[in-house]
Design a protein with these regions (language model features):
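ADP-ribose/NAD+-binding catalytic cleft of ART/PARP-like enzymes
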Residues: 1-41, 55-56
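Active-site and NAD+-binding cores of ADP-ribose-processing enzymes
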Residues: 5, 13-15, 22-23, 60-137
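Conserved aromatic
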Residues: 43-45
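Short active-site loop/helix that positions an aromatic residue
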Residues: 47-61
Length: 137
């Protein structure tokens, strides 16, 4: 993995209710395409980026959660967003094959408008249905 110089703090957004000391691991279905088993666990230095991911991942009846996490191994820039629409890694998104340790739950994040969440979910679903979405895994 390429050395990344961002040292955090790091956040992960999810629909899972976890406890301090738990570990997030790769090897589960993608939140965006259930046909894909993820080889990496993703995280960001942007708290509101993690919260948006959690809100998109969470079902309508599920509560999104944002956690302060600590990588337990090497990590790299997320190739799904790095050097795509914009040069570099403006989303400050990373991924690792090593687990992320839950340090704390974060509650001071921005709730996105439901229509924005629904719109992005619909776009993801349409791209997945039409096989136009590819996760670099």
């Amino acid at each position: 993995m390429e050395k990344v110089h961002d040292e955090g703090p790091f956040y992960h957004g999810t629909k899972a209710k976890l406890k301090i000391g738990d570990y997030l691991r790769a090897g589960f279905a993608s939140n965006y395409d259930s046909r894909v088993t993820m080889n990496h666990i993703y995280f960001t230095t942007l708290k509101d980026g993690a919260s948006f991911a959690a809100q998109i991942a969470a079902g309508k009846a599920e509560v999104p959660h944002v956690y302060l996490v600590e990588p337990t191994g090497p990590y790299e820039n997320d190739p799904n967003v790095t050097d795509k629409k914009f040069p570099g890694n403006p989303t400050r998104s990373y991924r690792s094959t090593a687990p992320l340790k839950i340090i704390a739950e974060v509650t001071d994040w921005v709730q996105q408008p439901q229509d924005k969440i629904d719109s992005l979910r619909e776009k993801i679903a349409a791209r997945t249905t039409n096989n136009k979405s590819t996760i670099i895994n």
